[in-house]
């Protein structure tokens, strides 16, 4: 078992990574939001079971959560425990941050992607109609309990897709960790628990370091967490890939962009593509001409766009990055680099 703490405006968050974690040591007066189909993590605690996926992040479901908290007598001494994937954790963060102006929150992520990404950062949101994350808060959990036991039955494709985020942390923030991931790809795919524990732990340490210095996205430093996501989001929406698969494709596209701009050696692009492939992730995707055009067009609506440019975090070498203003046309070229015509 590994643990660390990170600081923020509300105090300190404890992060624990291991197998068979003793939840009771970290939680007092729990009420639980649990994703449908999961075993009850805290027997006897009042529990509201919800569906997983993006649909849970609605005002209708949020109202249901508020009603549940009121019915069970939740107050500011209560701990809201969120058990599930990233979407449910987002909803729970919003609910905890707004119910009675804030109650204690503990995250128990049950997918690898949620462990290395959504569980840490303090972002909570619900969607408004077709607009994702339109209404949101920053609200840090008191604890994040990454129990690797949940991953034993995670479907293989879903499991593998999360490694795109792990590779991202190494590429952008820690060259030594990137080398470690490259050398331990087989162990990670085999679900070697020692390797997996370190991968989750180090990924969260790196993300926490960013959150500590730019908790509210005011300094531009947190932009580094978007490496691979500018192109990745467009590819995800058009081709229906899993989030991690789309990020993997986006990483290759944005590394190629960095190389063409003279920041990154071409050999690093090829190496990263090889690492992602070794983890079972795509590095390019077949697309129709229409899909290619749609993905390129979506880049124009990226939230980081300012006029005819998009601010993109570019890796300049493993472990180092810069925030660069890139012409939209250049980003569209990057999309076309990883989407090749296949229908």
From Swiss-Prot:
**Positions bound to Zn(2+):** 165, 229, 243
Keywords assigned by UniProt, alphabetized: Amino-acid biosynthesis, Aromatic amino acid biosynthesis, Cobalt, Cytoplasm, Lyase, Metal-binding, NAD, Nucleotide-binding, Zinc
Protein location? Cytoplasm
Q: What is its EC number?
A: 4.2.3.4
Q: Which GO terms describe its biological process?
A: amino acid biosynthetic process; aromatic amino acid family biosynthetic process; chorismate biosynthetic process
Keyword Amino-acid biosynthesis belongs to the record: yes
The cofactor named in the record is:
Co(2+); Zn(2+); NAD(+)
Query: Which SUPFAM superfamilies does the entry mention?
Result: Dehydroquinate synthase-like
Q: How is the cofactor bound?
A: Binds 1 divalent metal cation per subunit. Can use either Co(2+) or Zn(2+).
Organism superkingdom: Archaea
Annotated Gene Ontology cellular components are: cytoplasm
Mainly localized where?
A: cytoplasm
Q: Does the keyword Lyase apply?
A: yes
Q: Name one GO molecular function term.
A: metal ion binding
Top class in the EC scheme? lyase
For this protein, the record's InterPro entries field holds: Dehydroquinate_synthase, DHQ_synth_AroB, DHQ_synth_fam, DHQS/DOIS_N, DHQS_C
The entry's family comment says: Belongs to the sugar phosphate cyclases superfamily. Dehydroquinate synthase family.
UniProt-listed HAMAP family: DHQ_synthase (MF_00110)
From the Swiss-Prot or TrEMBL record, give the protein name: 3-dehydroquinate synthase
Write down the species: Pyrobaculum islandicum (strain DSM 4184 / JCM 9189 / GEO3)
| Gene name for this UniProt entry | aroB
């Amino acid at each position: 078992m590994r643990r660390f703490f990170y600081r923020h405006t509300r105090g300190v968050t404890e992060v624990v990574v291991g197998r068979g974690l003793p939840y009771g040591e970290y939680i007092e007066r729990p009420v639980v939001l649990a994703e449908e189909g999961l075993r009850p993590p805290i027997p006897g605690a009042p529990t509201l079971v919800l569906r997983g996926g993006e649909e849970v992040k609605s005002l209708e479901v949020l109202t249901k959560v508020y009603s549940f908290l009121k019915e069970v007598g939740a107050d500011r001494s209560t701990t809201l425990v969120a058990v599930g994937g990233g979407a449910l954790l987002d909803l729970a963060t919003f609910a905890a941050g707004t119910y009675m102006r804030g109650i204690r929150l503990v995250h128990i992520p049950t997918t690898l992607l949620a462990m290395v990404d959504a569980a840490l950062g303090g972002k909570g949101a619900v969607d408004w109609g077709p607009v994702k994350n339109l209404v949101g808060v920053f609200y840090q959990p008191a604890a994040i309990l990454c129990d690797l036991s949940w991953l034993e039955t995670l479907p293989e494709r879903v499991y593998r897709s999360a490694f795109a985020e792990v590779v991202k942390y190494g590429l952008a923030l820690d060259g030594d960790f990137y080398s470690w991931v490259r050398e331990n790809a087989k162990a990670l795919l085999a679900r070697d628990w020692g390797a997996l524990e370190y991968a989750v732990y180090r990924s969260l340490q790196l993300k926490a370091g960013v959150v500590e210095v730019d908790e509210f996205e005011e300094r531009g430093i947190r932009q580094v967490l978007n490496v691979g996501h500018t192109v990745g989001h467009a590819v995800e929406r058009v081709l229906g890939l899993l989030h991690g698969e789309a990020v993997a494709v986006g990483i290759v596209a944005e590394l190629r962009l960095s190389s063409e701009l003279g920041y990154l050696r071409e050999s690093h692009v090829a190496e990263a593509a090889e690492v992602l492939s070794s983890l079972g992730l795509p590095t390019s995707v077949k697309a129709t001409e229409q899909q290619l055009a749609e993905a390129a067009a979506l880049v124009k609506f990226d939230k980081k766009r300012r006029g005819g440019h998009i601010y993109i975090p570019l890796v300049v070498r493993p472990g180092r990055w810069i925030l660069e203003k890139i012409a939209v046309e250049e980003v569209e070229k990057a999309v076309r680099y990883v989407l090749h015509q296949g229908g």
